Amino acid sequence: MDGEGFGELLQQAEQLAAETEGVTELPHVERNLQEIQQAGERLRSKTMTRTSQESANVKASVLLGSRGLDISHISQRLESLSAATTFEPLEPVKDTDIQGFLKNEKDNALLSAIEESRKRTFVMAEEYHRESMLVEWEQVKQRVLHTLLASGEDALDFTQESETSYISESGAPGRSSLDNVEMAYARQIYMYNEKVVSGHLQPSLVELCTEAAERLDDKNVSDLWVMVKQMTDVPLIPASDSLKSRCSVQMQMAFLRQALHFLEQSYKNYTLMSVFANLQQAQLGGVPGTYNLVRSFLNIRLPAPIPGLQDGEVEGYPVWALIYYCMRCGDLMAAQQVVNRAQHQLGDFKNCFQEYVHSKDRRLSPTTENKLRLHYRRAVRASTDPYKRVVYCIIGRCDVTDNHSEVADKTEDYLWLKLSQVCFEDEANSSPQDRLTLPQFQKQLFEDYGESHFAVNQQPYLYFQVLFLTAQFEAAIAFLFRLERTRCHAVHVALALFELKLLLKSTGQSAQLLSLEPGDPQGVRHLNFIRLLMLYTRKFEPTDPREALQYFYFLRNEKDSQGESMFLRCVSELVIESREFDMLLGKLEKDGSRKPGAIDKFTRDTKTIINKVASVAENKGLFEEAAKLYDLAKNPDKVLELTNKLLSPVVSQISAPQSNRERLKNMALAIAERYKSQGVSAEKSINSTFYLLLDLITFFDEYHAGHVDLAFDVIERLKLVPLSQDSVEERVAAFRNFSDEIRHNLSEILLATMNILFTQYKRLKGSGPNTLGRPQRAQEDKDSVLRSQARALITFAGMIPYRMSGDTNARLVQMEVLMN
């Protein structure tokens, strides 16, 4: 069958070709297959385009026609519209044409007012947009700064040992985010604040934290707090601020004494433990004391004679080794005992050492010191006895560039040696190699050596000790805070120093965690204490708001850049984030009284804090929460103002169980009942708007329930819209006094009222003229009244200076027409 079809097609083609050849006046056109295909595609595309356009027009007509629009007339109506008559230049008028002149002046005034309003609107929109962008950018900056826990390259340290910040972590709801160490510290903070708030004698926060550390069964942490306790046991120097106090010579000398005492006591304990661990080798005996302890320790430390030791022995032990280790244990009297026994071998050293022992700050007089330094340079510097050299360098505070690594082979020994050589007097005659100041030593440890030298990932507590013992408290805390496992210890050390007024705080809240400030002496750094505390509490604020509140209490006297209390600010953010309004701020009872919350413990002026939290909630758009908080703070103006904003969008909605409208309605009714029973009232305009909105809710409830007569009675009593031509002017004048919350519902109110009139009209028409014995005349009168009321609504809608939503006017007119 296919063969027959092709054969027939071939026959027709040949016939067509023969007919074409017979017409001699037509030229022959020869095309190959590709040209024929292209021509066919062009014809097909033209046909498809025309068909698709017609199809689109048909679809548009169907769509718009279903909405009652005639597409054939739309283009004609659009072409007939012209904006030229509105904004075209006014025609010139003759000088004697008063009517034309007045018309032009009126039009000019209207156009000027419109243009001015347009410009002002655009300027205000730009300003609001710019302010919003600045606020948002500031929040982003704060979040970025809060994630940078340290300055410089340390903030971008992504080594394997660095642990992930907890800032992004969130604990499981209902569970505490605090681990056992953090909880132990939190209990001590609670106990401390209890004493402070109750007005009792302020306890020592260092003591409380030390007790918590002892229960943790971690020697590193226990030693840390022993060191903190030792270093903070200094008399506070009276000064106008912490910086002057910390930089005073008396305070620095006090820190130095405490650091030396800590290192000496630690070494003595180490010596004692070494001896008791090797009793057989140590051969401990004799009168208990440092001298015999050192002798036993030397049996372990120097089991065999060391070549090069000078000036003989005392009871078989090297003289200078005995002196050094007695000094290292902090017992100068034991060292004096050794010197006295070997005085014939030591020459004038006995007198120098005796003066050193009995001096106030372990400092020789300038004459004796110069004499000792001269002897050191001439005879001792080249000595083969390392113990002799180090003792001379300590007593004479000379040759500070020599680290004496043969003797001081541990970090603690090096620290003790250098701190023993630090001087505070301004010595003009001293050479640089004989002078070491505390700022120089601090710089050497923190900047020259730094973290890499001390292998901080393996021994973080050692580096903290190095910085803390050299009075670099802020740098030590910032370092420890960067490590996840030691962060809580750093925070509580900072709290302890803060309470003792020994902490140097940053002046700006946006500063880095550790910062330098212009004009500060060398070696001084500031800690952003507020940021440190806020970063720490962020982890457990959602799950443990009570504990976070305890920490925020330390900020009660701190101010932000706007002079606002940081305690207020942090509490407000805590309440908003945790949503624990009742637990933190208290709860409003049915009788209007307030049940105290956690905040009541810390301040009597709870109203200020609650108002602040409410203000923050309002600024964040949390109007419902803000209204409840203002109610808690006894601020009826703000309560009703925000309730009006909440009610306005839902007034005309159909009520449903557990809906947003139902919840807000119940809240508003409870407020209204309580305020009426207690005689509470707000500002007159806010008050009237609130109760009018409640009446409108009643109106729409009846309307949606189909109770048109009850709804009509409500709207008639409200006198919000005119129901007669005589009251139109009065209602239009009264409309100007209504708030925006009422105006926004005007379209729905008018439509609902017109629907009620139309429903009554249809019911009247459907009842018949003689139903229930109603006379014809009465029915006509009722008809006339309903039409008059509908006409009054139309007139009112056209006269009010308010642009109603959508096609309100068209729908009103449509229903009014159906009633005629």
UniProtKB/Swiss-Prot annotation:
UniProt record, GO biological process: mRNA transport; nuclear pore complex assembly; protein transport
One family name in Pfam for this protein: Nic96
Entry keyword Ligase: no
Entry GO terms, CC: nuclear membrane; nuclear periphery; nuclear pore
Topology within the bilayer: Peripheral membrane protein
Chain's role: Plays a role in the nuclear pore complex (NPC) assembly and/or maintenance.
InterPro entries referenced in this protein's UniProt entry, alphabetically: Nucleoporin_int_Nup93/Nic96
Protein name: Nuclear pore complex protein Nup93
Example GO molecular function: structural constituent of nuclear pore
Subcellular localization: Nucleus membrane; Nucleus, Nuclear pore complex
Keywords (A to Z) from UniProt: Membrane, mRNA transport, Nuclear pore complex, Nucleus, Phosphoprotein, Protein transport, Translocation, Transport
Keyword Membrane carried by entry: yes
Family classification: Belongs to the nucleoporin interacting component (NIC) family.
Membrane-crossing residue ranges in chain numbering: none
